[in-house]
């Protein structure tokens, strides 16, 4: 007697629902994640026990490299009051105007320079070299930052501000114009990120310049 052959049924797994869930999860993470911004130099901070979170808006971050070079990063408001790009543009124009008022070697910005600065996450070159830096391709700009830094020294005479103090005042004025300077007035809108190997004396100079 011959064996009865049982017809094998084709197994089919419907992945439609799983695909939908995957898309939803990817969308969620894209909308809620905070992407790490590229910094001009690597700054390895020392361990901290502070439970205070660094604000993610209306913030001026001061990066202090191990060799003492200083850079700035700016974040605007979360809403459309003063976006980060608009804040950078306003700060650049104000800083250059303040610099030109006390220096004979004037800096002349073009629309191209302003647009390039709007897209720059971090910056830190002498103002006199700003246009030259902004004229560089992005990858060359990144390399140039590593050997530059914002000029800063101990100074308590605000009638003759350091370039770092010019930038700080420009940031405050730009936020004040937008009605968003409260955090900076209270000090919560300023963050200093220094490398674990940065001499404390250098960090103290930065704090004294604020």
Regions found by a protein language model. Name each.
Residues 36-210:
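Long, low-hydrophobicity, acidic/polar, solvent-exposed interaction domains
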Residues 3-40:
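Hydrophobic single transmembrane helices highlighted by the model
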